[in-house]
Amino acid sequence: MTILDGKKISNDIKDEIAGEVTKIKKRGEKVPHLAAIIVGKDGASMTYVNSKVKACERVGFESSLFRLPHTVSELELLDKIEELNENDDIDGFIVQLPLPPQINTQKVLNAVDPDKDVDGFHPTNFGKMALDMTSFIPATPFGILELLERYDIPTKGKHTVVIGRSYIVGRPMSILMGRSGFPGNSTVTLTHEFTKNITQVTSQADIIIIAVGIPDFLKGEMIKDDAVIIDVGITRVPDDHAERGYVIKGDVDFENVSKRASFITPVPGGVGPMTVSMLLKNTLLARERHHKRAVDAKK
């Protein structure tokens, strides 16, 4: 069994991006600029956004953080998004989720300029991804693809089972694993909470990608020997014996599943670190496309 070390691969990617930024600086060009909007003071969201800011500093990006109160109106948030859409200095930006109940999340995500949508959540980018066109791939699925590629895990002709159908992970993964190329060319089964006899499905899978937010959902008896297991889940489970009062658990019963798997991602340290690095990679791509448009406009 091989651990898919997302932390190591994530650091490798950051080093590669930092190298590209050095080249950009040597050419006297503007470095990539990533911005984030965060609404309220949700602890997990704050931690995630702060990790993005630190990652930007490490690779040499500019970063901007816009904090809005929990009471912000939908119109005020949309105005801030439009402001960032029109700011030529910003190459890409994200709106940190979740948003408070007075705000329509889909309406907000739809308001982001697709050319700056480095989270890859805009319908334009999702549609382009489904059609194998140039787009921004959502950061978590992008990170999973990168792990599969860097560990040279075969996907062609394999049966991939995706558990969970969110637009952030499950649905894009089902599209990406079935597309032409590598990683891809899999036969994909997309499952969810209404799938009957799910063990019958998972036990036939060569690759399982799970993102349901239920700790230890995938058990050892639910997989076949030598399956590849990608665990996207991350849940804080109360634990009186833990220093922080909780432990982090994934969707996979790691102790038992790892005994049968050929490759497996740990939680933490697997998919999580990859998400931030791929957000940076999307921002670098956004900057390159932005720069090309600016150069072409001067011709």
UniProtKB/Swiss-Prot annotation:
Keywords of the record: Amino-acid biosynthesis, Histidine biosynthesis, Hydrolase, Methionine biosynthesis, Multifunctional enzyme, NADP, One-carbon metabolism, Oxidoreductase, Purine biosynthesis
SUPFAM superfamilies referenced in this protein's UniProt entry, alphabetically: Aminoacid dehydrogenase-like, N-terminal domain (SSF53223), NAD(P)-binding Rossmann-fold domains (SSF51735)
Presence of the UniProt keyword Metal-binding in the record: no
Assigned EC number: 1.5.1.5, 3.5.4.9
Source organism superkingdom: Bacteria
UniProt cross-references to InterPro entries, sorted A to Z: Aminoacid_DH-like_N_sf, NAD(P)-bd_dom_sf, THF_DH/CycHdrlase, THF_DH/CycHdrlase_cat_dom, THF_DH/CycHdrlase_CS, THF_DH/CycHdrlase_NAD-bd_dom
Gene Ontology MF: a single term: methenyltetrahydrofolate cyclohydrolase activity
Binding site for NADP(+): 164-166, 234
Pathway the protein takes part in: One-carbon metabolism; tetrahydrofolate interconversion
Catalysis: reaction(s): (6R)-5,10-methylene-5,6,7,8-tetrahydrofolate + NADP(+) = (6R)-5,10-methenyltetrahydrofolate + NADPH; (6R)-5,10-methenyltetrahydrofolate + H2O = (6R)-10-formyltetrahydrofolate + H(+)
Gene Ontology biological process: L-histidine biosynthetic process; methionine biosynthetic process; purine nucleotide biosynthetic process; tetrahydrofolate interconversion
GO cellular component annotations of the record: cytosol
UniProt record similarity statement: Belongs to the tetrahydrofolate dehydrogenase/cyclohydrolase family.
Subunit structure of this chain's protein: Homodimer.
Function: Catalyzes the oxidation of 5,10-methylenetetrahydrofolate to 5,10-methenyltetrahydrofolate and then the hydrolysis of 5,10-methenyltetrahydrofolate to 10-formyltetrahydrofolate.
Protein name listed in UniProt: Bifunctional protein FolD
Naturally occurring in which organism (per UniProt): Christiangramia forsetii (strain DSM 17595 / CGMCC 1.15422 / KT0803)
